[in-house]
């Protein structure tokens, strides 16, 4: 019950999240550490574990929470949890997604950002960058891409059905790892190398590229269906049209955020010649094109920069998205 109450309080109150000290993060990670070599025995223990994970995620939406997460070696614990091809691997991915997502500008009292949302300026919050580097340095990419590719047999496939958001979280984490590491640096290249052929591995990059394009096309189709449905409703005389905001929310519900994260990964990978050729081929097979990816990313950047429809402060967004804008220009 204590785990459930803690989770409810942290989710319900931004003030509670801001006031929680590093001691709470440490206690939660200690509870989580038990599952490095243990799988929940029943649904009650599973619910307990999910509450612990949710609490860590909520704390990780604040700068202080991210700092405590790094200091308490939370990144290293995540990698250990992801070594287990069971439920802990997928639940720990949720924590990684929240931990990598940079926090919003210092709020009055506002809800936590959606993972992958607005980025705080690098000079005011460096924890997401540190988390990205630590995760890569601790060999976390191996397990992240195993999750992306649904490796692990029938038991893992069953878990993916229980946690259908896993694909979105995996792509979001890859997108943030690419954005939070300096282009051309060893950590950045280690992420990119998963999509690029090398002398040591000339095969595995193709399935990774194909998987990203597959998810990109699937989410694009869902968003397109939402657009079509909204257009039909907007043409109905009895429909109360609330304009662009309602359309935006409908598109988000259908998978716009996931599509944008996949677009970001595609944009980074397409900077390399061989992957770019394969991306173009796979996109065409799915009825997509790089022009569509460019258009969606342009909309993503401009919407956030406008400071509307859920974007953070204009200055923070401009600083954070400058690198992405440069990538977009080179497509």
Residue ranges and their predicted role:
Residues 228-331:
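Long C-terminal extensions of eukaryotic subunits of large macromolecular complexes
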Residues 24-38, 76-85, 137-155, 195-234, ...:
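Amphipathic alpha-helical segments within extended alpha-helical solenoids and repeat-rich scaffolds
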Residues 148, 153-171, 175-193:
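Long, charge-rich C-terminal accessory regions
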Residues 1-14, 30, 47-64, 80, ...:
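Alpha-helical solenoid repeat architecture
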């Amino acid at each position: 019950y204590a785990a459930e109450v803690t989770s409810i309080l942290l989710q319900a109150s931004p003030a509670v999240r801001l006031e929680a000290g590093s001691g709470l993060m440490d206690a939660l990670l200690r509870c989580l550490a038990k599952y490095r070599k243990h799988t929940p025995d029943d649904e009650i223990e599973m619910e307990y574990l999910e509450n612990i994970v949710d609490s860590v995620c909520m704390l990780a939406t604040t700068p202080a929470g991210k700092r405590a997460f790094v200091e308490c070696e939370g990144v290293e614990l995540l990698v250990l949890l992801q070594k287990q091809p069971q439920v802990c691997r997928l639940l720990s991915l949720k924590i990684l997604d929240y931990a990598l997502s940079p926090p919003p500008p210092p709020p009055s009292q506002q809800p936590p950002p959606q993972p992958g949302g607005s980025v705080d300026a690098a000079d005011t919050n460096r924890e997401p960058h540190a988390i990205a580097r630590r995760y890569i340095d601790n060999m976390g990419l191996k397990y992240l891409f195993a999750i992306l590719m649904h490796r692990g047999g029938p038991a893992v496939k069953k878990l993916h059905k229980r946690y259908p958001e896993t694909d979105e979280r995996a792509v979001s984490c890859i997108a943030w790892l690419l954005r939070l590491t300096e282009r051309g640096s060893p950590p950045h290249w280690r992420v990119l190398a998963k999509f690029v052929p090398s002398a040591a591995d000339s095969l595995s990059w193709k399935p990774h590229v194909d998987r990203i394009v597959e998810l990109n096309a699937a989410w694009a189709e869902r968003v397109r269906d939402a657009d079509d449905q909204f257009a039909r409703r907007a043409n109905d005389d009895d429909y109360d049209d609330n304009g662009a905001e309602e359309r935006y929310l409908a598109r988000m519900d259908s998978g716009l955020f996931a599509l944008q994260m996949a677009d970001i990964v595609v944009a980074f990978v397409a900077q390399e010649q061989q992957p770019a050729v394969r991306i173009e081929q796979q996109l065409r097979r799915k009825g997509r094109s790089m022009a569509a990816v460019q258009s969606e990313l342009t909309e993503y950047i401009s919407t956030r920069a406008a400071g509307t429809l859920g974007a953070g402060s204009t200055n923070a967004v401009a600083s954070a998205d400058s690198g992405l804008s440069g990538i977009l220009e080179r497509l």
